[in-house]
């Protein structure tokens, strides 16, 4: 039986689908601009980024499609919008580099994971190139081969 992998203590959520759908060329760390109720909901583990992606407007980067489910005990004077567009905090050079690459054919900018760094929420984003169907099959085949190889090696030791 396979053991269920535990996520690191500071990790909030991960986009496992991104590594299957894309070749990750380069990764960046970006801060997230959040409201108070969002931070409280994230601490409760109510964030998902599986369908999220990054868009660029007016030389700024935004996380679009990330879902933060509001808590029932959240503030009554603020109406929570669970899928609002959130600003990513990056350096100007990083934004220019990402925008230049995304404008090329086939490149995309996707969130890979969100985690706590001290008391701040950070988002690891990746500059990604889309995989074709045969690339996905090759990746699965290589992963299965490595697993079988490890099993065989383990049996030889016993």
Curated annotation (Swiss-Prot):
Pfam families: SmpB (PF01668). Residues 141-158 have a biased composition (Basic and acidic residues). It is found in: Cytoplasm. PROSITE patterns: SSRP (PS01317). GO terms for biological process: trans-translation. GO terms for molecular function: RNA binding. It comes from the Bacteria. SUPFAM superfamilies: Small protein B (SmpB). Belongs to the SmpB family. Required for rescue of stalled ribosomes mediated by trans-translation. Binds to transfer-messenger RNA (tmRNA), required for stable association of tmRNA with ribosomes. tmRNA and SmpB together mimic tRNA shape, replacing the anticodon stem-loop with SmpB. tmRNA is encoded by the ssrA gene; the 2 termini fold to resemble tRNA(Ala) and it encodes a 'tag peptide', a short internal open reading frame. During trans-translation Ala-aminoacylated tmRNA acts like a tRNA, entering the A-site of stalled ribosomes, displacing the stalled mRNA. HAMAP family: SmpB. This is SsrA-binding protein. It comes from Psychrobacter cryohalolentis (strain ATCC BAA-1226 / DSM 17306 / VKM B-2378 / K5). The gene is smpB.
């Amino acid at each position: 039986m396979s053991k269920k992998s535990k996520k690191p203590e500071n990790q909030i959520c991960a986009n496992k689908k991104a590594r299957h759908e894309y070749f990750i060329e380069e990764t960046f760390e970006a801060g997230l601009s959040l409201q108070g109720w969002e931070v409280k909901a994230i601490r409760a583990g109510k964030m998902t980024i599986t369908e999220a992606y990054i868009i660029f407007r007016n030389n700024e980067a935004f996380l679009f499609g990330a879902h933060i489910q509001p808590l029932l005990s959240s503030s009554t004077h603020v109406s929570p919008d669970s899928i609002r567009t959130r600003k990513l905090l990056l350096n100007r050079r990083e934004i220019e580099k990402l925008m230049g690459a995304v404008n090329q054919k086939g490149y995309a900018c996707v969130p890979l994971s969100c985690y706590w760094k001290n008391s701040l929420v950070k988002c690891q984003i990746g500059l990604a190139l889309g995989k074709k169907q045969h690339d996905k099959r090759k990746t699965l085949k290589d992963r299965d081969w490595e697993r079988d190889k490890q099993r065989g090696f383990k049996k030889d030791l016993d």
